[in-house]
A protein has these predicted regions:
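Short S/T/G/P-rich N-terminal loop/turn motif that feeds into the first structured element of a domain
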Residues: 1-84, 98-107
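C-terminal structural segments of small proteins and small subunits
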Residues: 88-94
Length: 107
């Protein structure tokens, strides 16, 4: 039993966590975008990917600009976002794909 716990602890500490910050324009209102992102099916999808949404915010200077901070396994969110097949899914939320600024950090 002790050996199992030790190996599980090692797995947890060895996994690289990525924090991904997306800054982008919206094609709809911030409230519509936020509602979409917090919807049960959207959150279920993130949960299946091991991704958590830590922050969804609207720019004070431009109400059509939003920032979202995600955290999850390295490359998961980035790879999905960079896949051209994901573009229609991303844009269905109101997120304008073109011009999105992506900042990535690992820990």
């Amino acid at each position: 039993m002790g050996k199992d716990l030790k190996s599980k602890k090692h797995f947890i500490t060895a996994m690289t966590i990525e924090t991904t910050i997306l800054d982008f324009q919206l094609s709809n209102t911030f409230e519509q975008y936020e509602f979409h992102m917090n919807a049960k099916e959207q959150q279920s999808m993130f949960k299946e990917m091991g991704v958590k949404t830590f922050y969804i915010g609207k720019s004070l200077d431009d109400p059509q600009r939003a920032t979202v901070i995600f955290q999850g396994p390295e490359n998961v969110l980035y790879d999905i976002f960079m896949n051209p097949e994901s573009k229609p899914i991303v844009e269905a939320s109101g997120h304008i794909y073109a011009g999105t600024k992506i900042t990535r950090r690992i820990s």
